[in-house]
């Protein structure tokens, strides 16, 4: 008994010490978990009397520190999301998801951010591609020298032919666009019959076999025009190319699965550098255009607009929305192509509009500018080939009016 009494105080003391250590370890583990995991409660509201689908919600992650993975739920349903590194510094800057809402609905979402792990994988609903030809590949739509970025010096003799399909291309289920890698930086269009992704299979060069299977193809001849909303300079009388430049870059910022982001970077043009960013969301036929300058450009005027498709009819609300509907050959190869009918549209916020120029034989032009170092606008189009789209100028112009009044002017409201 004496021996037991001798050791008891020591055992008791060691037991207390162990409990303190264990408690400290548990608290440290809890604190570590709390730091590694953050929860955001978000409410997304549809302000309109019509249901809305695939409405973009973008969360700035700057104040949340290191984020490597995210999980979004509404109730028990997991919602696909996407993390993007916008400035390409290997840290995610934005979280994006798409909301489906009934008329006037307010829907709650729970966002959990994780400091470890990797982004969750979801089915791709957009696609982007930048590549050079592989001399060993004979099929025109199976080239596989994929790039993420390419820069040409300003004195590059022929950047247009460096890249396969002549520039970066991207798509949602409803559209497909390529941007020429030259001084025009024009947007050329791919028309679809079915609502799906196709450019990975066709690479903008659809074979006869693919056409027989219902794949789409190039539907617009653009020449030196704006095509669909190319950003240009303005010399006081007419649009000018973004040229000469010190260098010209095309790069893909994000491949999806919910939005793809591509950028055109022009350095050393008229003493400014500019970045033209195109954002394509899944489920959308419209594309967001943001132009960023390296300094305020209040003293500069620029231009954009849409091509005057041969024989086209025009619509304008004279407040930034302009559209056309017309038919023309998309290529001089009349054996493998047919005349294509398209509807085009552009919508520019009124604060950027300096003038709306009268239509000429080539295009419908806006003169634009900004008091700071950023401006933005939206572009949109349809093909008459679509089984899911519009098939007359009246249908298309009515759609454009509704698109502006709802999607453009009344985006969903996000609170968190």
What does each model-identified segment do?
Residues 1-41:
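Bacterial Sec-dependent N-terminal signal peptides
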Residues 37-142, 149, 153-158, 165:
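Alpha-mannosidase-like glycoside hydrolase catalytic domains involved in N-glycan trimming
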Residues 69-95, 310-329, 348-354:
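Solvent-exposed beta-strand/loop surfaces of large extracellular or lumenal domains
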Residues 87-101, 344-416:
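Beta-strand-rich recognition/accessory modules
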Residues 102, 106, 252-258, 282, ...:
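A short, structured loop/turn motif at beta-sheet edges
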Residues 115-241:
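Solvent-exposed N-terminal domain segments of exported/luminal and surface proteins
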Residues 212-283:
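Extended, loop-rich substrate-binding clefts of extracytoplasmic carbohydrate-active enzymes
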Residues 274, 285-318:
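Acidic (Asp/Glu-rich), glycine- and aromatic
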């Amino acid at each position: 008994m004496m021996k037991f009494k001798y050791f008891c105080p020591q055992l008791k003391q060691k037991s207390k010490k162990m409990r303190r250590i264990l408690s400290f370890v548990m608290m440290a583990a809890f604190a570590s978990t709390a730091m590694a995991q953050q929860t955001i409660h978000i409410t997304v509201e549809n302000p309109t009397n019509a249901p809305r689908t695939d409405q973009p919600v973008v969360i700035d992650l700057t104040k949340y520190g290191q984020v490597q993975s995210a999980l979004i739920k509404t109730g028990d349903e997991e919602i696909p999301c996407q993390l993007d590194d916008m400035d390409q510094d290997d840290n995610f800057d934005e979280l994006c998801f798409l909301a489906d809402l009934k008329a006037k609905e307010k829907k709650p979402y729970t966002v959990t951010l994780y400091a470890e792990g990797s982004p969750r994988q979801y089915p791709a609903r957009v696609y982007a591609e930048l590549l050079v030809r592989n001399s060993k590949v004979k099929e025109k739509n199976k080239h596989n020298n994929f790039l993420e970025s390419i820069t040409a010096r300003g004195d590059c003799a022929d950047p247009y032919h460096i890249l396969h399909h002549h520039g970066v291309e991207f798509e949602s289920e409803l559209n497909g666009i390529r941007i020429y890698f030259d001084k025009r930086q024009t947007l050329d269009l791919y028309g679809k019959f079915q609502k799906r992704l196709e450019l990975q299979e066709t690479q903008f060069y659809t074979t006869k076999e693919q056409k027989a299977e219902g794949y789409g193809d190039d539907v617009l001849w653009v020449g030196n025009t704006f095509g669909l909303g190319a950003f240009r300079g303005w010399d006081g009388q007419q649009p000018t190319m973004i040229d000469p430049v010190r260098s010209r870059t095309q790069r893909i910022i994000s491949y999806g699965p919910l939005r793809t982001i591509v950028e055109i970077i022009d350095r050393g043009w008229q003493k400014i550098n500019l970045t033209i960013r195109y954002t394509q969301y899944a489920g959308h036929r419209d594309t967001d255009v943001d132009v960023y300058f390296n300094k305020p450009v209040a003293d500069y005027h620029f231009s954009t607009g849409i091509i005057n498709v041969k024989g086209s009819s025009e619509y304008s609300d004279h407040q930034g929305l302009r559209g056309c509907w017309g038919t023309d050959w998309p290529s001089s190869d009349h054996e493998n192509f047919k005349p294509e009918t398209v509807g085009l549209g552009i919508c520019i916020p009124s604060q950027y509009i300096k003038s709306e120029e009268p239509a000429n034989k080539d295009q419908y032009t806006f003169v634009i500018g900004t008091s700071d170092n950023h401006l933005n606008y939206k572009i949109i189009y349809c093909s008459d080939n679509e089984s899911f789209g519009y098939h007359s100028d009246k249908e298309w112009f009515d759609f454009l009016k509704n698109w502006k009044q709802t999607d453009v002017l009344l985006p969903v409201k996000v609170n968190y």
